Regions:
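Short, solvent-exposed micro-motifs at the edges of structured domains
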Residues: 1-151
Length: 151
């Protein structure tokens, strides 16, 4: 079984390098509005994970007061199951049958939300899975059967 809390999410805003005091970077943190919850009204959904109303752009060439990694993505929970049967075939030979199921309950494992406050159309949306590869934690249910002959 694999279980973990959500990974940290760093909320940023894109700014012109001329509007940043150092001029070195265009990705800054926005200002956090005191008293406004990071959880959207009505609760979190895959298309509205972080409340955009909790942030405001930084005026002028200052820096935002939103802490680094202020939000958390969705948690991950995945159960795997494996069964094994040894079948003796005389004294010298043996057969082994093994069945494995990964993501037994076929639970969707969502990735991190988009967290660029300068893109309000997609801010807070989760558009992908934890793992987009063919194997590993976060993939859809997979069943693997193995028959092994040992001598």
């Amino acid at each position: 079984m694999t279980a973990r809390t959500g990974l940290p999410v760093n909320v940023t805003e894109d700014r012109s390098s001329t509007s940043v005091a150092t001029g070195y970077t265009t990705s800054q943190r926005p200002n956090l509005i005191a008293g406004v919850s990071l959880t959207p009204p009505g609760g979190r959904t895959r298309l509205n994970w972080i409340n955009l109303a909790a942030f405001t752009p930084v005026p002028g060439s200052g820096y935002g007061n939103a802490p680094r990694n202020i939000a958390r993505g969705p948690s991950l929970w995945q159960a795997d199951l494996g069964l094994l049967k040894h079948i003796p075939l005389g004294e010298r030979f043996q057969m082994q049958f093994r069945g494995e199921v990964f993501n037994l309950f076929n639970r969707a494992q969502w990735g991190l939300p988009l967290a660029d406050s300068s893109s309000p159309a997609t801010f807070g949306q989760i558009l992908g899975m934890v793992n987009s590869g063919p194997v590993g934690t976060g993939t859809p249910r997979q069943i693997q059967l193995t028959l092994r002959f040992m001598f």
